[in-house]
Amino acid sequence: MILYRNCPICGSESLRGFAIDTQRKGPHISRVECLKCKLVFANPMADSQELADYYTGYYEKDHYESVDYKRLILNHFQRIEKLDKSEINKEARFLSKLEQESKFLDIGCGLGLGLAYAHQLKCELYATEFDLGALEFVKNHFPVKTFQGDIWEAKYPDNHFDFIHISHVIEHVLDPKAYISEMMRILKPGGYLAIGTPNISSKLYRFHRWSKLIRMNIPDVIDGLEHTFIFPKKLLRSLCEEQGLVVDDHYTHNFGEKFSNLIHYKMPLKKKLNRLIQNVFQVNQWLISRKPVF
């Protein structure tokens, strides 16, 4: 375990307790907040070996209800096969800068939803993922070059990809600054990076925390206990700009946008309601940036 006395992003010593959760299973139980940059992070934090052990068989764990979840993903694949470029842009705004036949890298590809969109646009597909079962799943459905492990170990060449997609991964890593720097290195000049991650500055996080404090209860963790860092929008943007990336779009889903998508999704009503709640309160953010052409 790693114990932080200072904020791992800005170095400030001004930290305070933020949440604790001892009821659920996960590599972390407590979080702190940096009062300077507003980052929320696990402290103590699992080290690289502990996280690697946790992510082994990640998509087979009980909380993913593995068989049903994979069936849901396959339903998405079938639906995406019928979409054209304009429909993909409307449904997945974070891919609006993705051009057909681009060289596309999905970091932490999971079960391949991002790959499905890129494949529909006839892109050349690459993917990294820790979970071997997930990699086997995507290879069974797409012509994708895969790497099992972290982005550093893949050793991709400089200026190699037209588009990098990293959805709900940056909040799982141990060094987000270095991660963004590495993605900047392997991105072509003029290429795009799309980062999807929770938004700690959302109304739902604030409401949940203060509703607990008012009742004299210790706030618990409402997202995944495996998360290492949860970013406010302003901080995520500044981390990208510090690496020289130019932010083109930075948004959270509004209710109407996601509701129109969810009508067509084949998933249990409970999951649909959960997704709606997350998007009504702007729990998740997308940041799309590009590497300048010098």
Feature-to-residue mapping (PLM):
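S-adenosyl-L-methionine-dependent methyltransferase catalytic module, highlighting the catalytic core
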Residues: 152, 166, 174-182, 192-294
